[in-house]
């Protein structure tokens, strides 16, 4: 988890891979249901850098509450996220592992603690911008966190897709290649919708 704050962030600009420090290019963005969040570069494109190389511009950013960037920069500057071991009372310890151990319990959700998951996907060309917005909350009925719902049900959707032989290609495939198949794409969204996880799609002209 902490590595996303230290690993250089790669994105695509004018069909070239560009690398910048994590936490760079900060923006404040307003979201319905949540309010203002700050976004920053993280190395989240991963396989998409290569599987979607025909797309000239791609960027992934992480969203957190305002103030998060300065907090993490403070930890980095103080050395808490260094991976090089240091000597402490005769023992070699990794600052990164030490910090992770300290924060692990702080990150744990309390029993029935409510949280939410937010994601926005924006796709633009010369004519229009298409947005897919996801907002999901803790399910009080099933007592399931939104992160468990949005990730877990996506995995079980993929398993059901294979069982129903909707995706029959052989080999190892990242999710974006499965999504290129329109049938699989709609199966995934409908599966999530049945479990009250909704991606809201909107379209706007680039030049109204």
What kind of region is each of these model predictions?
Residues 1-208:
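C-terminal catalytic/substrate-binding lobe primarily of soluble NAD(P)-dependent oxidoreductases
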